[in-house]
Amino acid sequence: MSGRGKQGGKARAKAKSRSSRAGLQFPVGRVHRLLRKGNYAERVGAGAPVYLAAVLEYLTAEILELAGNAARDNKKTRIIPRHLQLAVRNDEELNKLLGGVTIAQGGVLPNIQAVLLPKKTESHKPGKNK
């Protein structure tokens, strides 16, 4: 009989996601699928979704860290859109990157023009004018 013999072959290894292989939290498989379905190019390389997922994860972590700092400065434990707005607009590089982006319920940065501020008057001290 030509059988397979004993099933002493190697057991199949546990499946490991591409995200965990790359050490990422963002889904590499989903990014790959979106790149393929988005008609950006005829073919998509294996490294492209890993790189893009890593960039997206880094930018998200950067914004969330700054927004968390803004929330802590306002003595809040929950990040709201206002904190995201303050985080992005107070950071020079993120503000340039997201210059054309409107954050809903974000408000505006507090800013008063210098000409509108009250003028500081010189106080007359005795003994100075002679």
From Swiss-Prot:
Residues bearing Symmetric dimethylarginine?
Answer: 4
Cross-referenced PANTHER family: HISTONE H2A (PTHR23430)
Principal subcellular localization: nucleus
Give the GO terms filed under biological process for this record.
heterochromatin formation
Positions of the region Disordered? 1-22
- Places the protein is found: Nucleus; Chromosome
Q: Which gene encodes it?
A: H2AC21
- Provide the protein name: Histone H2A type 2-B
